[in-house]
Swiss-Prot record:
Broad class of the protein's primary localization: membrane
Membrane topology according to the record: Multi-pass membrane protein
PANTHER family linked to this entry: CYTOCHROME BO(3) UBIQUINOL OXIDASE SUBUNIT 3, CYTOCHROME C OXIDASE SUBUNIT III
SUPFAM superfamilies hit by this protein: Cytochrome c oxidase subunit III-like (SSF81452)
UniProt feature coiled coil, ranges: none
Keywords: Cell membrane, Membrane, Translocase, Transmembrane, Transmembrane helix
GO-annotated cellular components: plasma membrane
Family of the protein in this entry: Belongs to the cytochrome c oxidase subunit 3 family.
EC identifiers of the protein: 7.1.1.9
Top-level lineage group: Bacteria
Protein name per UniProt: Probable cytochrome c oxidase subunit 3
Source organism per UniProt: Streptomyces avermitilis (strain ATCC 31267 / DSM 46492 / JCM 5070 / NBRC 14893 / NCIMB 12804 / NRRL 8165 / MA-4680)
Amino acid sequence: MSVVATATTVETGHAHPSVNRPNLTSVGTIIWLSSELMFFAALFAMYFTLRSVTGPEHWKEMASHLNFPFSATNTTILVLSSLTCQLGVFAAERGDVKKLRMWFIVTFIMGAIFIGGQVFEYTELVKKDGLSLSSDPYGSVFYLTTGFHGLHVTGGLIAFLLVLGRTYAARRFTHEQATAAIVVSYYWHFVDVVWIGLFATIYMIK
């Protein structure tokens, strides 16, 4: 993941030059994401605890029901959406609202595809393999970890719509709108990194 700046180059309309310092909104978002990281750390701990209790052989048997190629493709889409999101941030820092809209719309579509793929995977697991939230400890932890992440991705999609809506509603692109785009990118990169960890843990570790 590329590191994003916390200050923008968009004109603010003040006569005096702006100081290149961290934006308080961005700093607050980073602190909040740190608390979210602890939440997902607890989910990871639950996963490995249940795995050790039920035994690795049972875990391996249940994991065989997962569609690895499909999930790997879905993961690739989410990872690439982080790149398009960052391109949108670069556009926001230049004050290029048209490019910001373009890249954020592309990111939104890719994120929506990821969520659609996750719903499809859930449907297949329930219908074909009978793996549900209450059928098995593995099913419980699988749906809880991936489901909570899916809710976070959905929250990110809503945030993209809000940022895009503000750019269309406002008469001019402002520093505050650029900051909002940067803050949303922090969140999106976060859910991307968390998913990479979940994917490696659930789909790759035997």
